[in-house]
Amino acid sequence: MKKITFLTICLSLFLVGGLFSQQTVYVSATGAGSKDGTSEANAYGNFSFALVDINSAEDKLIVIGTVTVGAATIWNKNFAFTIEGKDATSTITGNGGASRLFTLNQSTTIDVTFKDLTFSNYNSNLAGGAVLLSNNAGATVTFDNCIFTDNSISNGAGGGAILFANGNLTITGTTFKSNTSTDEGGAIMGLSGTITITNSVFESNSAATKGGAIYSSSANFTITGSTFYDNATTGIGNSDGGAAFNVAGAGSTNSITNCTFYQNTTARANQDYGTIRTDNGNTTVSNSLFYGNKMDNDTAGPSDWGSGPNGTQTFETSIAQWISINIDNQDEGTGSITGIKGGAGTPANLTSSNLTFNLATGKVEYVAVDSTEDSPIDFGSDGNDVGAWNSGLTLSLEKEDFLATKISVYYNSASKNLEVLHSISEPISLEVYTILGTKVLSLNNINARQLINVNHLNTGIYILVGKTPEKFFSKKFLIN
């Protein structure tokens, strides 16, 4: 009897351990094979059924193709798991009305990561967050390489795609495009909690009142290396504005670094309610570029950062055309853009750089200019550039991403040679500029491995510009 009991216990533990071990579950629009989710060939045809099998830490749900989901329950999963797209076609789409994809209102320690997914056409009339509403201090939510497009909220709570309160939200390499709110936060509304956004794109989002892309009540935002393009607020009420970012609450602390704000608009004709609007809290903007941002429905401007008298605002080493007189601390970089506060002085003029937004890359691009012209990487006359240069801003020369993967630059301090290695099949020419924009070197038809003697150049930072018949790239290097 004792032997039987012992064997029974061991067998039970084995079965339980197997039941709750890490597993991968598959779901598609119509399902396949036996529809038990055990493989792509046997994918579930129902998203909610597939979620039931996500029952232990590190489980993964793979989404195949386009799956339509009304509302899904994940709040009861008190562990870390991932919902991931199989490929670029993996999409979760909604059917609108009185539904929201995910709601995390209950007390939970959920840690969920969404990866390689598109969330589209969730048009909800619920109170905030068409794709996600989270109001739980124990929640950790991550979106990695996702796309939110054409989601909307028509209830007054705001957050066309996401409404987040408490907990921790991390967004990396994600695009928010054409999301809307009939109130605040066209893409994201942060009531509280910690929200970190890195290397992401906010394009053509809109809100009827505040925060065309993002609205912060008392959340703490850290935004780095991201682009805000063509976002808008459409209301003309007394507090409406902040086409890209609006901060309202005294408890909000925000950091914006290495970001680009380009061609965002507000409906109001008040310059103090432009691309960013801060009414309270503590907000710091550094190493960023503001350009072509307008007010009065794109007919007037510029209007980059408007602010009320409350809170603390810091604007440093950044390029802009107009910021409010209520900005407390202004350090543009010696000799660079001093005087734009309140419209005095000379605003940035980057006309010759021909800034454009590349829909494919989600980046603002510019063309190379003469040394006498201001550009995003060479602004001012003191060699202390702001914006792109000091920060590695989210700017690139035309088609730079393509070329940058095919070229390397090394400086050998012993031989005083610059070594350039590339695998570009087209003819390529190189130019070297000082930090002030003076051309000091020019070579045509360089070899796949080219040694360039730069012994005659002084120590300092230089810009290497490469050109093919159709493309440009730029790299910086140091001679020491």
Language model segments and positions:
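C-terminal outer-membrane/trafficking sorting elements
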Residues: 400-480
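Beta-strand signatures of extracellular beta-sandwich domains
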Residues: 26, 62, 429-433
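Right-handed parallel beta-helix/beta-spiral solenoid domain characteristic of secreted/periplasmic
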Residues: 79-124, 350
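Predominantly extracellular beta-rich ligand-binding scaffolds that present long acidic/polar faces
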Residues: 71-78, 113, 133-134, 140-145, ...
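N-terminal extracellular ligand-recognition/capping segment immediately after the signal peptide
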Residues: 58-81, 87-90
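Surface beta-loop-beta hairpin patches that serve as ligand-binding interfaces in beta-rich domains
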Residues: 362-396
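Bacterial Sec-dependent N-terminal signal peptides
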Residues: 1-23, 397, 451, 466, ...
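Acidic Gly/Asp/Thr-rich repetitive segments characteristic of extracellular carbohydrate-active
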Residues: 30-62, 370-378, 412, 440
